Protein backbone atom coordinates (compact mmCIF):
# COMPACT_ATOMS: atom_id res chain seq x y z
CA UNK A 1 0.00 0.00 0.00
CA UNK A 2 1.46 3.35 -1.06
CA UNK A 3 -1.03 5.36 0.93
CA UNK A 4 -4.63 6.50 1.21
CA UNK A 5 -6.24 8.96 -1.19
CA UNK A 6 -9.03 10.47 0.86
CA UNK A 7 -11.42 11.63 -1.87
CA UNK A 8 -11.13 11.19 -5.62
CA UNK A 9 -11.89 14.40 -7.57
CA UNK A 10 -13.92 16.16 -4.85
CA UNK A 11 -16.36 18.95 -5.66
CA UNK A 12 -17.31 19.14 -9.33
CA UNK A 13 -17.18 22.63 -10.90
CA UNK A 14 -20.87 22.70 -11.80
CA UNK A 15 -22.28 22.73 -8.24
CA UNK A 16 -24.15 25.94 -7.42
CA UNK A 17 -22.52 26.01 -3.98
CA UNK A 18 -18.99 25.36 -5.25
CA UNK A 19 -17.36 28.15 -3.19
CA UNK A 20 -19.07 26.98 -0.02
CA UNK A 21 -18.03 23.37 -0.68
CA UNK A 22 -14.46 24.37 -1.53
CA UNK A 23 -14.13 26.06 1.85
CA UNK A 24 -15.13 22.83 3.59
CA UNK A 25 -12.63 20.57 1.82
CA UNK A 26 -9.48 21.28 3.84
CA UNK A 27 -11.26 21.05 7.22
CA UNK A 28 -12.71 17.71 6.07
CA UNK A 29 -9.24 16.51 5.09
CA UNK A 30 -7.89 17.49 8.50
CA UNK A 31 -10.59 15.53 10.32
CA UNK A 32 -10.02 12.48 8.13
CA UNK A 33 -6.24 12.60 8.54
CA UNK A 34 -6.60 12.88 12.32
CA UNK A 35 -8.86 9.81 12.37
CA UNK A 36 -6.46 7.80 10.22
CA UNK A 37 -3.49 8.72 12.39
CA UNK A 38 -5.24 7.22 15.40
CA UNK A 39 -4.72 3.78 13.83
CA UNK A 40 -1.97 4.30 11.23
CA UNK A 41 0.96 6.65 11.63
CA UNK A 42 2.99 5.10 8.83
CA UNK A 43 1.31 5.46 5.45
CA UNK A 44 1.25 8.48 3.14
CA UNK A 45 -2.06 10.31 2.78
CA UNK A 46 -2.85 11.67 -0.68
CA UNK A 47 -4.97 14.80 -0.90
CA UNK A 48 -6.82 15.63 -4.11
CA UNK A 49 -7.79 19.19 -4.94
CA UNK A 50 -11.23 20.56 -5.73
CA UNK A 51 -12.67 20.59 -9.27
CA UNK A 52 -11.32 17.30 -10.64
CA UNK A 53 -8.15 17.45 -8.51
CA UNK A 54 -7.10 20.69 -10.22
CA UNK A 55 -7.85 23.64 -7.89
CA UNK A 56 -5.21 23.75 -5.16
CA UNK A 57 -6.04 27.34 -4.21
CA UNK A 58 -8.55 25.91 -1.72
CA UNK A 59 -5.68 24.67 0.48
CA UNK A 60 -4.03 26.99 3.02
CA UNK A 61 -2.36 24.70 5.56
CA UNK A 62 0.02 21.85 4.76
CA UNK A 63 1.57 21.58 8.20
CA UNK A 64 -0.93 19.38 10.04
CA UNK A 65 0.70 16.07 9.03
CA UNK A 66 4.23 15.06 8.07
CA UNK A 67 3.28 12.38 5.51
CA UNK A 68 1.07 14.27 3.06
CA UNK A 69 1.28 14.06 -0.72
CA UNK A 70 -0.92 16.12 -3.03
CA UNK A 71 -2.41 14.53 -6.13
CA UNK A 72 -3.52 16.23 -9.35
CA UNK A 73 -5.32 15.05 -12.49
CA UNK A 74 -5.15 16.28 -16.07
CA UNK A 75 -6.75 15.30 -19.38
CA UNK A 76 -5.82 17.01 -22.62
CA UNK A 77 -4.18 20.40 -23.01
CA UNK A 78 -0.65 21.23 -24.07
CA UNK A 79 2.15 18.85 -23.14
CA UNK A 80 4.27 21.59 -21.58
CA UNK A 81 5.55 22.69 -18.19
CA UNK A 82 3.44 25.84 -18.59
CA UNK A 83 0.31 23.66 -18.66
CA UNK A 84 1.30 22.31 -15.23
CA UNK A 85 2.40 25.66 -13.81
CA UNK A 86 -0.29 25.91 -11.12
CA UNK A 87 0.47 22.40 -9.87
CA UNK A 88 4.21 22.99 -9.83
CA UNK A 89 3.83 26.39 -8.13
CA UNK A 90 1.62 24.96 -5.41
CA UNK A 91 3.92 21.99 -4.91
CA UNK A 92 6.90 24.29 -4.50
CA UNK A 93 5.04 26.65 -2.17
CA UNK A 94 4.25 23.89 0.33
CA UNK A 95 7.45 21.90 -0.30
CA UNK A 96 5.55 18.62 -0.53
CA UNK A 97 5.33 16.00 -3.31
CA UNK A 98 2.87 16.33 -6.18
CA UNK A 99 1.65 13.14 -7.85
CA UNK A 100 -0.28 13.01 -11.14
CA UNK A 101 -2.78 10.35 -10.09
CA UNK A 102 -4.67 10.38 -13.39
CA UNK A 103 -3.71 11.52 -16.83
CA UNK A 104 -5.53 10.48 -19.97
CA UNK A 105 -4.51 9.31 -23.39
CA UNK A 106 -4.20 11.64 -26.36
CA UNK A 107 -1.75 10.78 -29.14
CA UNK A 108 1.31 8.66 -28.47
CA UNK A 109 3.50 11.71 -29.20
CA UNK A 110 1.54 13.89 -26.75
CA UNK A 111 1.72 11.19 -24.13
CA UNK A 112 5.48 10.77 -24.50
CA UNK A 113 6.03 14.55 -24.33
CA UNK A 114 3.84 15.00 -21.27
CA UNK A 115 5.56 12.14 -19.48
CA UNK A 116 8.92 13.79 -20.13
CA UNK A 117 7.62 17.12 -18.83
CA UNK A 118 6.33 15.53 -15.63
CA UNK A 119 9.54 13.66 -15.01
CA UNK A 120 11.63 16.78 -15.70
CA UNK A 121 9.58 18.57 -13.04
CA UNK A 122 9.76 15.72 -10.52
CA UNK A 123 6.07 14.82 -10.71
CA UNK A 124 5.27 11.13 -10.36
CA UNK A 125 2.50 9.88 -12.64
CA UNK A 126 -0.07 7.20 -13.39
CA UNK A 127 -1.67 7.08 -16.82
CA UNK A 128 -5.29 5.92 -16.72
CA UNK A 129 -6.48 3.29 -17.28
CA UNK A 130 -4.15 0.29 -17.11
CA UNK A 131 -6.36 -1.92 -19.27
CA UNK A 132 -9.53 -1.46 -21.29
CA UNK A 133 -11.15 -2.66 -24.48
CA UNK A 134 -9.11 -0.70 -27.01
CA UNK A 135 -5.53 0.38 -27.60
CA UNK A 136 -5.44 3.55 -25.45
CA UNK A 137 -4.04 1.63 -22.49
CA UNK A 138 -1.17 -0.66 -21.56
CA UNK A 139 -3.14 -3.90 -21.85
CA UNK A 140 -6.02 -4.30 -24.29
CA UNK A 141 -9.00 -6.56 -23.56
CA UNK A 142 -10.36 -8.69 -26.39
CA UNK A 143 -14.11 -8.32 -26.82
CA UNK A 144 -15.88 -11.69 -26.59
CA UNK A 145 -18.47 -13.05 -28.96
CA UNK A 146 -21.91 -11.41 -28.53
CA UNK A 147 -20.51 -8.51 -26.49
CA UNK A 148 -22.36 -6.22 -28.88
CA UNK A 149 -25.63 -7.59 -27.46
CA UNK A 150 -24.59 -6.57 -23.95
CA UNK A 151 -23.72 -3.08 -25.17
CA UNK A 152 -26.93 -2.76 -27.19
CA UNK A 153 -29.04 -3.64 -24.16
CA UNK A 154 -27.19 -1.21 -21.90
CA UNK A 155 -27.80 1.59 -24.42
CA UNK A 156 -31.41 0.72 -25.28
CA UNK A 157 -34.33 2.94 -24.20
CA UNK A 158 -35.55 2.02 -20.72
CA UNK A 159 -38.22 4.56 -19.97
CA UNK A 160 -40.77 1.81 -19.33
CA UNK A 161 -40.73 -1.82 -18.27
CA UNK A 162 -42.04 -2.68 -21.71
CA UNK A 163 -39.01 -1.08 -23.38
CA UNK A 164 -36.68 -2.96 -21.06
CA UNK A 165 -38.39 -6.28 -21.79
CA UNK A 166 -38.36 -5.64 -25.54
CA UNK A 167 -34.63 -4.85 -25.54
CA UNK A 168 -33.65 -7.73 -23.25
CA UNK A 169 -31.40 -10.21 -25.10
CA UNK A 170 -31.28 -13.95 -24.55
CA UNK A 171 -30.01 -14.40 -21.00
CA UNK A 172 -27.91 -17.45 -21.80
CA UNK A 173 -26.12 -15.58 -24.58
CA UNK A 174 -25.30 -12.49 -22.53
CA UNK A 175 -24.33 -14.53 -19.48
CA UNK A 176 -21.78 -16.39 -21.57
CA UNK A 177 -20.56 -13.10 -23.04
CA UNK A 178 -20.04 -11.74 -19.52
CA UNK A 179 -18.19 -14.87 -18.41
CA UNK A 180 -15.99 -14.69 -21.51
CA UNK A 181 -15.30 -11.01 -20.83
CA UNK A 182 -14.16 -11.83 -17.29
CA UNK A 183 -11.75 -14.42 -18.68
CA UNK A 184 -10.49 -11.97 -21.30
CA UNK A 185 -9.72 -9.48 -18.52
CA UNK A 186 -7.18 -11.83 -16.98
CA UNK A 187 -3.72 -10.40 -17.51
CA UNK A 188 -2.49 -13.46 -19.39
CA UNK A 189 -5.31 -13.01 -21.92
CA UNK A 190 -4.80 -9.28 -22.52
CA UNK A 191 -2.92 -7.82 -25.48
CA UNK A 192 0.11 -5.65 -24.65
CA UNK A 193 -0.23 -2.30 -26.45
CA UNK A 194 3.39 -1.84 -27.46
CA UNK A 195 3.18 1.73 -28.79
CA UNK A 196 1.36 2.92 -25.68
CA UNK A 197 3.83 1.25 -23.33
CA UNK A 198 6.84 2.61 -25.19
CA UNK A 199 5.40 6.14 -25.15
CA UNK A 200 5.63 5.94 -21.35
CA UNK A 201 9.32 5.17 -21.56
CA UNK A 202 8.74 1.56 -20.58
CA UNK A 203 9.86 -1.65 -22.24
CA UNK A 204 7.13 -3.78 -23.81
CA UNK A 205 7.67 -7.51 -23.43
What does each model-found stretch correspond to?
Residues 110-205:
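Aromatic-rich peripheral "rim/lid" segments of glycoside hydrolase catalytic domains that contact
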